[in-house]
Amino acid sequence: MPPGVDCPMEFWTKEESQSVVVDFLLPTGVYLNFPVSRNANLSTIKQVLWHRAQYEPLFHMLSDPEAYVFTCVNQTAEQQELEDEQRRLCDIQPFLPVLRLVAREGDRVKKLINSQISLLIGKGLHEFDSLRDPEVNDFRTKMRQFCEEAAAHRQQLGWVEWLQYSFPLQLEPSARGWRAGLLRVSNRALLVNVKFEGSEESFTFQVSTKDMPLALMACALRKKATVFRQPLVEQPEEYALQVNGRHEYLYGNYPLCHFQYICSCLHSGLTPHLTMVHSSSILAMRDEQSNPAPQVQKPRAKPPPIPAKKPSSVSLWSLEQPFSIELIEGRKVNADERMKLVVQAGLFHGNEMLCKTVSSSEVNVCSEPVWKQRLEFDISVCDLPRMARLCFALYAVVEKAKKARSTKKKSKKADCPIAWANLMLFDYKDQLKTGERCLYMWPSVPDEKGELLNPAGTVRGNPNTESAAALVIYLPEVAPHPVYFPALEKILELGRHGERGRITEEELQLREILERRGSGELYEHEKDLVWKMRHEVQEHFPEALARLLLVTKWNKHEDVAQMLYLLCSWPELPVLSALELLDFSFPDCYVGSFAIKSLRKLTDDELFQYLLQLVQVLKYESYLDCELTKFLLGRALANRKIGHFLFWHLRSEMHVPSVALRFGLIMEAYCRGSTHHMKVLMKQGEALSKLKALNDFVKVSSQKTTKPQTKEMMHMCMRQETYMEALSHLQSPLDPSTLLEEVCVEQCTFMDSKMKPLWIMYSSEEAGSAGNVGIIFKNGDDLRQDMLTLQMIQLMDVLWKQEGLDLRMTPYGCLPTGDRTGLIEVVLHSDTIANIQLNKSNMAATAAFNKDALLNWLKSKNPGEALDRAIEEFTLSCAGYCVATYVLGIGDRHSDNIMIRESGQLFHIDFGHFLGNFKTKFGINRERVPFILTYDFVHVIQQGKTNNSEKFERFRGYCERAYTILRRHGLLFLHLFALMRAAGLPELSCSKDIQYLKDSLALGKTEEEALKHFRVKFNEALRESWKTKVNWLAHNVSKDNRQ
């Protein structure tokens, strides 16, 4: 490729030639030009360059090769130092095939880590530096120290504690009733295969599923001593059991049947294969994975500064004048010239409007409209709450065309929203902001209520300053000195003077209000009563804190002080109530701190269950440094599994401008506190990058060639060294305990859907058949809704198991990893209902009505006595998914997104529609039934007998019990879905979507009424199942996907 020709990313991913001609610029001014392998790493290229440079002029002026570093211009047109010389040229993908060698400056280790972090989080750390934002700089310094101290503490852990951090236990839910649910396996004998680390010899033992890991290890040590005729000197306490071929360990005082791996083996009839690992090996791993020598740089001791006079400041509460701002002008406004421009401004505390909105005068449309207008709000400066935000909406107005027969003289005007922006009135140090501000605005999107202002939106300006519309405002100086919000001591001092009223009749009214209207809007007189009885709420109804906070007058500083004084002595809340306080409706920082304090009692498993929502709630935070961020980072640095998923939840949204800064800073902090895990994550990132390039290649190739030809070219591409290296020997992003060892190229393929998802298969020699793992890589589909749905199904599974009800669910892994990209776990040994029916039928038109197809397929996969167990698995899982899909309102159910495993477990896939957002055609709802319960399902449940009502009634009982259990936890689902509104999912954007859950769980009814409601839906699903079969017939005929 000649100099001056740009190299788009496609050039580096296409393998037209193994080499590329690169221009090299040496520090001496010498220019060299020669071909190098695109697969070569920078270290190799530097060696070749040095060999050639010795024959060029001025070579004697060059220092040692290690004194120089390559730079290039990257795909975003930025000059980039290539500190990591193990990276390949094809992975770097410079914009031009030009590499410049420059003298290395600064600390190489530090620069290398910074380079790796930048690559990993998808944002250069120099971008954070260039902001010159004091809040960003203070946050980075504080979080770096926080995370590196956590890393230093981790290096001092004993081997068991370090094992708990690196390989957290994977246990089945253990609670009341669940132990009883395990009794049927607890009494069984279990064959376990155990070998010792570094030895090929293995022993098979028969143990009880009630035995602890220590008992199994003691048995193995005795066997080893007997076989090799050695004295028994080693103790089982010095060992842990590793699952072969996985990053998963068994340890601690738990019966074997409580470990997920053992339970999985029991259900599938496989023999567990374990390796005994000595504590010295685990300590060696700890030392190898420790952070490099502490990066916390303690500043040199300096002589104490000369005492300075404390700058004068003014308390906000001493200023009683009305709050006002000056609207100066707009910039880069784009609107129809026939319209008029208006700015609306409002003061908000969460969703609550603190006073009436104010609007500017109308001005003619132009690129830079000028107002120079004072906007005064109906609130005193002293009453501004700490978390008050000033919200702006820029919109155009146009007179609606008057109808011919209209007799109205006054013409109506229509609003056309253009952009919005939000600004916190106080900075992160509690100081009231003053002076001129330029607010870069975000484009407006239609709102269901037609609201112009967006108080829940980000308070960060649009980073696209080159083209974004902007407002210039002036915040006046309200005092001769800086104005600060009062410190907590001053707040409490004022708050303790609040009155306390107590009347017996009012106590009864209070109880009735909190119980009757626990989740609805209160009338004004009810709000007044709840506030008046706030001390009684604290004493007798502490879980109603959210209700009290909502009635607090946040535009009256005396009431705010009394509320916060009460909060200081409020009893710690249960997790459910604390989760509710993280919603945008409760922005106060002291309330947030109290909520996090209540959440600290969460176990790691519970925290992991809610992690997705907690990450989304970060978007509501007004400042970078907040309790929620520190809480998540602290737990992530104490549990690598939590750290893994925290990273990917953040990384998957780095393309969203409104959160890229916050999420990038949190990831940077995490990486500095876990540099070894950073390398693991980088390996995953490299694999995902290769899969995206491979998918792009397949999409283009499939348009030109047949599927077999494209598949063969896909395999050729995968066999290249760079692909094999990137795609092999990594931890699965879907589950870090799963190792993706050797990629099985011949078994890899792509699917026929529009986005051509890749189907990638792996094998592991050490794990045997259990090491066969498949992943699906999707590029072009938004997987966030699938991930949320599967999270809820997994939560349902946990809640059921805690009540002793194991419905054999299959909540397979699903993880978005970037902008419309992500991974899905392959559920092996399974097939779709459509394929089973089509393969058992002669015609696609009759396949949907072949009621024997499913049962015959199960018989072929489960001969003899195994069939009864398979039918039981089908019955349990069918009950679970009937209830789950009904409660979640999952739509678009057809025979291609319902699957069955060979073991009998039924499960659903592809959750593109939920919460009752069903597909329609020609205005007609295509979803005719509450959930899928067809007669061929019933045929399997009844074991192929038409009069086996006992089996069917047992199935109905499973459904009713499962539904009743979910109802008891209804508020948990409501809170979790409410918090997920921050994600911006199209089908979870308004209160109507949440209302669907309230209706499906019948939360406004008694348990007896709710059960009656569910029975009506159950009978309807069974009665109307013929409509489902008609839909399936149409689906099968239109897409005869027989395989």
Swiss-Prot record:
Gene3D superfamilies in UniProt: 3.10.20.770, C2 domain, Phosphatidylinositol 3-/4-kinase, catalytic domain, Phosphatidylinositol 3-kinase Catalytic Subunit, Chain A, domain 4, Phosphatidylinositol 3-kinase, accessory domain (PIK)
Pathway annotation: Phospholipid metabolism; phosphatidylinositol phosphate biosynthesis
Domain C2 PI3K-type: 319-476
Tissue: Abundantly expressed in adult mouse spleen as well as in testis. Isoform 1 is expressed in spleen and lung (at protein level). Isoform 1 is expressed predominantly in leukocytes.
Chain positions found as Phosphotyrosine: Y523
Primary residence: cytoplasm
Signal peptide residues on this chain, from the entry's feature table: none
Phosphoserine modified-residue sites: S1038
GO BP term, pick one: phosphatidylinositol 3-kinase/protein kinase B signal transduction
Annotated knockout phenotype: Null mutants are viable and fertile but display defective adaptive and innate immune responses due to signaling defects in multiple cell types including B-, T- and mast and natural killer cells.
Segments of this protein annotated with the region Activation loop: 908-934
Region of interest (Catalytic loop), residue spans: 889-897
Domain PIK helical: 496-673
Domain PI3K-RBD residues, every copy: 187-278
Post-translational modification: Autophosphorylation on Ser-1038 results in the almost complete inactivation of the lipid kinase activity.
Assigned protein family: Belongs to the PI3/PI4-kinase family.
Annotated protein name in UniProt: Phosphatidylinositol 4,5-bisphosphate 3-kinase catalytic subunit delta isoform
Species per Swiss-Prot/TrEMBL record: Mus musculus
